[in-house]
């Protein structure tokens, strides 16, 4: 009977200690839950997210540097064409003077070494009007290797792609400006003006102190 009382007393003591510890444990759990719910979630800001991107752009070796002057060290791309490769330097218009259009136009490089003639065509004998007022520009004729002629039929041909090609301009100044813009060497051939002396039949009867002529209108 005494042993049963001791067991009951020990069980009651253990129950009291467990009930006393339960509020402290529950209080700590509740406080932790409340603190977690009260603390706002940390969201990364936009500025902090952009900083690595800026650093990556600055540290990237592929970033193109800003240039205020033309890059004269551009290599030639010979794979584009044997005759018309990419020029050694690309000018962006910041240079003084006239920029040759052949640098970036893609025209054959052979045209840059050609000489052009600027002239005013003469009026044919069968024409009496003044329609020949346009100035003409044509290229010089190559001497060797660009022309052949059939001895039997007399047919002629040439490997020069500008033979027989000419351009017309309204004034001589426009032709000169175009030649300078393209980078051509040019020379201007001024037209030969014919001076006519007015003649009249009445001049045969004018007084002349010198020896008389049969025909005075020559």
Swiss-Prot record:
Biological-process GO terms, alphabetical: electron transport chain
InterPro entries for this protein: NADH_UbQ_FeS_4_mit-like, NDUFS4-like_sf
Keyword annotations of the record: Electron transport, Membrane, Mitochondrion, Mitochondrion inner membrane, Respiratory chain, Transit peptide, Transport
Gene3D superfamilies: atu1810 like domain
Transit peptide region: 1-33
Subcellular location: Mitochondrion inner membrane
Renumbered residue ranges of the record's region Disordered: 31-74
Family designation: Belongs to the complex I NDUFS4 subunit family.
Subunit structure: Complex I is composed of about 40 different subunits. This is a component of the iron-sulfur (IP) fragment of the enzyme.
Function summary: Accessory subunit of the mitochondrial membrane respiratory chain NADH dehydrogenase (Complex I), that is believed not to be involved in catalysis. Complex I functions in the transfer of electrons from NADH to the respiratory chain. The immediate electron acceptor for the enzyme is believed to be ubiquinone.
Protein name (record): NADH-ubiquinone oxidoreductase 21 kDa subunit, mitochondrial
